[in-house]
Amino acid sequence: RIGSVGMLWACNGGGWLGHFISDSDIRNSKIKRLLEKGEIEEFYVESVKNPFYIRSEDTEYLNKKSTKKEVKFLAPLDNLLWDRKMIRDIFDFDYSWEVYTPVAKRKFGYYVLPVLYGNQFIGRFEPKQYRGEEELRLENWWWEDGIKINDRLIEKLEEGMNRFCNYLGAQQVNKDDWNNMVLNR
């Protein structure tokens, strides 16, 4: 489970659901055993009090700095997002999948995707591809507070959106949506 997310803490949360490890006593004894066997390692994230665990074979990633910053659009059920509290504590990003939330109670939208740039959540958006149309529509776009928009970020967003459109089989994102929602904050 730790490997599928990349890292986890021992706190209750979505990352531990299933596998009979949502019970904290069982989970903590398994973590202790994995630590003793050297299969996982403990580390701390600045400003988070609880320790995190990573597979020993993955520890090289802890000190690895990526020079390649890309924009990624995460699916609502992406492994990284399983533990919403962990994401909030590490990235200061509060995310909720509102697909089952009544329309009147939604903060954002029906199917909203987080936008990750390097190691920072910079926004979220609600895409929509209508049957028979070649363009991807943007129903909404929300920037996270404090994001500095510059030419490099826009270039990376365009690259990410092109990859996303290609993945979906769309020819392109609707230019009016892009200009009105993304470029004109």
Predicted regions and their residues:
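Long, charged, low-complexity, helical-prone intrinsically disordered regions
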Residues: R1-R185
